[in-house]
Amino acid sequence: MKSRNGPLRVGIGGPVGSGKTALTEKLCKAMRDDYSVAVVTNDIYTTEDAEALVRMQALPSDRIVGVETGGCPHTAIREDATINLQAIAGLNERIPDLDVVFIESGGDNLAATFSPDLADITIYVISVCQGEEIPRKGGPGITRSDLLVINKKDLAPYVGADLEVMDRDATRMRASRPFVFSDMKRGDGVSSIVNFLREQGGL
């Protein structure tokens, strides 16, 4: 499925604790039998997320690369994506038949975006636990990502979040751009995200 332009590069961003690594794990497990998949994770001072994905057996360890960004994690996905582009180039060299590379950003704020030179498709993950007002706060991740994932919907009753309000606000803020509610712990919403990637990414 490798295109002439190389593998489909999917950027996964969102605040700390929103569920980016859980989403990356679920997507890898859902797609690895049909596609050649790899992951690049971004952490400021460690490769903890990459190590977590290896422990979760999301993919073989040679398909998971962790980069230490230092400083502000958004710089490595936006202003200067060199470290990530180099990691992808290394994966391409080792695994020439790659179809999809997931690029998981370090936890960041609502203003974080991926450089178009780095990601073909962007997914932004927020958590119900961050408050029902998060969708209406806006920011590029909320309004301009190709897909918004509102995760941990199962916890809404425990944190006083109204999913109907979040649905309404997300619809208003994103206009025609899609979003999905998910519960990564149970895998709820994963199939919708995979279908989105297949359709939008031409897989």
From Swiss-Prot:
One of its GO terms (cellular component) is cytoplasm. GO terms for molecular function: GTP binding; GTPase activity; nickel cation binding. The keyword GTP-binding applies. It is found in: Cytoplasm. Facilitates the functional incorporation of the urease nickel metallocenter. This process requires GTP hydrolysis, probably effectuated by UreG. Pfam families: cobW (PF02492). GTP binds at G14, P15, V16, G17, S18, G19, K20, T21. The lineage of its organism: Bacteria, Pseudomonadati, Pseudomonadota, Alphaproteobacteria, Hyphomicrobiales. Belongs to the SIMIBI class G3E GTPase family. UreG subfamily. Homodimer. UreD, UreF and UreG form a complex that acts as a GTP-hydrolysis-dependent molecular chaperone, activating the urease apoprotein by helping to assemble the nickel containing metallocenter of UreC. The UreE protein probably delivers the nickel. Coiled coil: none annotated. One of its GO terms (biological process) is urea catabolic process. Keywords: Chaperone, Cytoplasm, GTP-binding, Nickel insertion, Nucleotide-binding. The keyword GTP-binding applies. This is Urease accessory protein UreG.
